[in-house]
Amino acid sequence: MAGYSGSPLTRKLGIGEGATVALLDLPAALEPELGTVSVLPSGVRVRRRAGGTADVVVAFVTAAARLERRIGPLGAMVFPAGGLWIAWPKRASSLVTDLTDHVVREVALPRGLVDNKVCAVDDDWTALRLVWRVEHRGGTAPLDPVR
């Protein structure tokens, strides 16, 4: 599905040739658009578990408490220059969530991550792209500077 913009979802998420991508808790409905080799750019390596490093991480989350627990390890996966997409159900979706863009920012910003893009994934999911602030990119990833 090209979504609202007409662009392929892989392009909207910044998944380019040769990238390492982690798709975490990918909903079954999105498998045809992200989870199959035929739709991905050439040479993309896909992982389904957290850990290690990745150029792009797309994490589907429905609970703020779970995001709080996972934001540190997820941020470390994309340090220093990758992109972390946090996807959550839209308000109009039938999926239950306590997440909004405001909650994602409240969790991410104090830890050194800043949002720079938003993506309408499909009719049920929206996502915010987080990257490390420029001043954090030169050293080591802050493990969890707020808590």
Model region roles, listed by residue range:
Residues 42-54:
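Short acidic low-complexity segments
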